[in-house]
Amino acid sequence: MSFIDPYQHIIVEHQYSHKFTVVVLRATKVTKGTFGDMLDTPDPYVELFISTTPDSRKRTRHFNNDINPVWNETFEFILDPNQENVLEITLMDANYVMDETLGTATFPVSSMKVGEKKEVPFIFNQVTEMILEMSLEVCSCPDLRFSMALCDQEKTFRRQRKENIKENMKKLLGPKKSEGLYSTRDVPVVAILGSGGGFRAMVGFSGVMKALYESGILDCATYVAGLSGSTWYMSTLYSHPDFPEKGPEEINEELMKNVSHNPLLLLTPQKVKRYVESLWKKKSSGQPVTFTDIFGMLIGETLIQNRMSTTLSSLKEKVSAARCPLPLFTCLHVKPDVSELMFADWVEFSPYEIGMAKYGTFMTPDLFGSKFFMGTVVKKYEENPLHFLMGVWGSAFSILFNRVLGVSGSQNKGSTMEEELENITAKHIVSNDSSDSDDEAQGPKGTENEDAEREYQNDNQASWVHRMLMALVSDSALFNTREGRAGKEHNFMLGLNLNTSYPLSPLRDFSPQDSFDDDELDAAVADPDEFERIYEPLDVKSKKIHVVDSGLTFNLPYPLILRPQRGVDLIISFDFSARPSDTSPPFKELLLAEKWAKMNKLPFPKIDPYVFDREGLKECYVFKPKNPDVEKDCPTIIHFVLANINFRKYKAPGVLRETKEEKEIADFDIFDDPESPFSTFNFQYPNQAFKRLHDLMYFNTLNNIDVIKDAIVESIEYRRQNPSRCSVSLSNVEARKFFNKEFLSKPTAESI
């Protein structure tokens, strides 16, 4: 039976750009004028400039003492055909002190027809003739992928992974409980989620992953999604050369050793100088640099110090042949002067793609950070290393950099990051200054001479390095401000048309039985204005976008997993978020995720916060759709919270602690400990603290393996009873307007 992916046939509207190619061929009789020619023979070069496009200025090399230069150099401009695009041509003479303009000319690109190619002469000073060859064509193959569907690589992964999971589930559940697994259509999609929470989340998630690996649950999962601190563990695990052949146990031993050191040891003058100088190369190439870059280097040096050149793209090798779950990471795009709780676009990262589902725009990971215009790369840079992305994914800590390093004057050492961030909005994080202009380090006119250019760059570098060093290691105003510490990247959606918005669940006939009523949607979980502006579009005119830690809106990466294209049946989430005390209700982040899902018309089981009053604090809670016959697309959620309950009595599930030492090692609080060993701001974990938190979550996970297995069995049966779970009947789809005409001619369609 062949399956059709209906999301593949949804039209994500975008306007095609034009590629304008200019070949600077040659010039004859270049002159500086009668008197100027008597003093010096011209050293000509040509500058091309179109103000309406990024990467707008191009230039040829120069020739010494040549009045009839032949360049034969080709340049490309990506243009918006709706703009009045004018090419400015400037003939220049290179000098040591100040370059001299010999003449200028203009050419209206609108005078060219698409598909046309011609040579055009330009006359300067009534003597010099320059010949340019110009051509104009449509960019029919943009570098962005415009689609609501998953990319082909992920679809291939899912097919392979289902084959593997089918056998793994039979082994996990035994022949009786897995008898419903007749084909891959019966295989449920299981996703594992890890929250933010700094090193507390990272260490806790390391224990979780060890338990899931050893129990066989990880072999039955399709996705592992992380946010902030959990992404740091995922990065450590997936970048390790021995994973997945080697399990988390040995890798966690390495991690424990790495986080036992004080992070201030990474801020020796020699190391900081090396960090900053390496970033100068990035800045001088035209890429934005913020404190997030430096924080990413510190995180990388701590966790993946021998793998600093690893990239996100390189992790594709780990999921080849679907040997392990596909890792998904996330951050937020935010706007200046708008609280991230009011507006934030979720950006998803996988080894295959980076993009925003809200706009149906995706790119390969090696293009993230490159300069785009209308969906086409106009300037490509090297792929950002994984440690830079780790800094972006956990950038809340670069915002409060001084607290992380322990040099803050604050006496409230027990306060959580969440408490400190309550009064921070995007306007404190995002610098809304003139840096939106292109950042290429450009010398003044006259630096064409290589020695002068080198001297100019060295002076600039020395000044910049000095400022950054002073900001890091002194109590300067720059060090104590939060402004400008968000990650900053070139806007990959610059120049696109966002007149049409796309719901995150475009094919779903959202019925009133499983939706929120108005009172529920109006009820605030954390803030009266939460999610108030989530339907607003991104600013496609801004040259830069700011990306921050997703935990600044809510601390669980549900938006990645709730995309209906992924068809997740069972979500196992682990919440390491800070709470006021160990006995506080643990559902704040889950309730925010629920509200976000309902506002985006995505199925989500009803979260009953009063279960805490009825049943008290537990290691995990199960939330199911109340009416499975109606809520056919609604996943089941097993929600683990950070709690030390049974671990105090048992050293393994069913095995009591007996000795005094065994009891003492497990007798600890997480949020009520006055020493705050598990504070969100703690970036040094002595071996005992690491083992306590790691072993606690290892135990909690293993102690509830039967809960997970039972949910998997129910998901298999649910799949069998609802074979059309991922199918779409066009007659029931409200979003028919999004389909192309060819697809609408089909009577029905089913997805994979």
Swiss-Prot record:
EC number(s) from the headed UniProt entry: 3.1.1.4, 3.1.1.5
Residues the entry annotates as binding Ca(2+) 1: 40-41, 43, 65
The PLA2c domain, residue ranges: 140-740
Biological pathway: Lipid metabolism; arachidonate metabolism; Membrane lipid metabolism; glycerophospholipid metabolism; Lipid metabolism; prostaglandin biosynthesis; Lipid metabolism; leukotriene B4 biosynthesis
Catalytic activity: a 1,2-diacyl-sn-glycero-3-phosphocholine + H2O = a 1-acyl-sn-glycero-3-phosphocholine + a fatty acid + H(+); a 1-O-alkyl-2-acyl-sn-glycero-3-phosphocholine + H2O = a 1-O-alkyl-sn-glycero-3-phosphocholine + a fatty acid + H(+); a 1-acyl-sn-glycero-3-phosphocholine + H2O = sn-glycerol 3-phosphocholine + a fatty acid + H(+); 1-hexadecanoyl-2-(5Z,8Z,11Z,14Z-eicosatetraenoyl)-sn-glycero-3-phosphocholine + H2O = 1-hexadecanoyl-sn-glycero-3-phosphocholine + (5Z,8Z,11Z,14Z)-eicosatetraenoate + H(+)
Residues at which Ca(2+) 2 binds: 40, 43, 93-95
Keywords: Calcium, Cytoplasm, Fatty acid biosynthesis, Fatty acid metabolism, Glycerol metabolism, Golgi apparatus, Hydrolase, Isopeptide bond, Leukotriene biosynthesis, Lipid biosynthesis, Lipid degradation, Lipid metabolism, Lipid-binding, Membrane, Metal-binding, Nucleus, Phospholipid degradation, Phospholipid metabolism, Phosphoprotein, Prostaglandin biosynthesis, Prostaglandin metabolism, Ubl conjugation
Induction: Levels of rat CPLA2 are increased in dentate granule cells during ischemia.
Modified residues (Phosphoserine): 2, 434-435, 437, 505, 511, 515, 727, 729
Claim: Repeat is one of the keywords in the record: no
Post-translational modification: Phosphorylated at both Ser-505 and Ser-727 in response to mitogenic stimuli.
Keyword Ribosomal protein on entry: no
Region (Phospholipid binding): 1-178
Tissue expression notes: In brain tissue, expressed in low levels in olfactory mitral and granule cells, in hippocampal pyramidal cells and in dentate and cerebellar granule cells.
Cross-link Glycyl lysine isopeptide (Lys-Gly) (interchain with G-Cter in SUMO2) placement: 541, 606
Residues bearing PTM Phosphothreonine: 268
Means of activity regulation: Activated by cytosolic calcium, which is necessary for binding to membrane lipids. Activated by phosphorylation in response to mitogenic stimuli.
UniProt-annotated stretches for the region Disordered: 427-457
Active-site residues per Swiss-Prot or TrEMBL entry: 228, 549
Domain notes: The N-terminal C2 domain associates with lipid membranes upon calcium binding. It modulates enzyme activity by presenting the active site to its substrate in response to elevations of cytosolic calcium. In the presence of phosphoinositides, regulates phospholipase A2 and lysophospholipase activities in a calcium-independent way.
Subunit structure: Interacts with KAT5.
PANTHER family: CYTOSOLIC PHOSPHOLIPASE A2
Protein name: Cytosolic phospholipase A2
Organism: Rattus norvegicus (Rat)
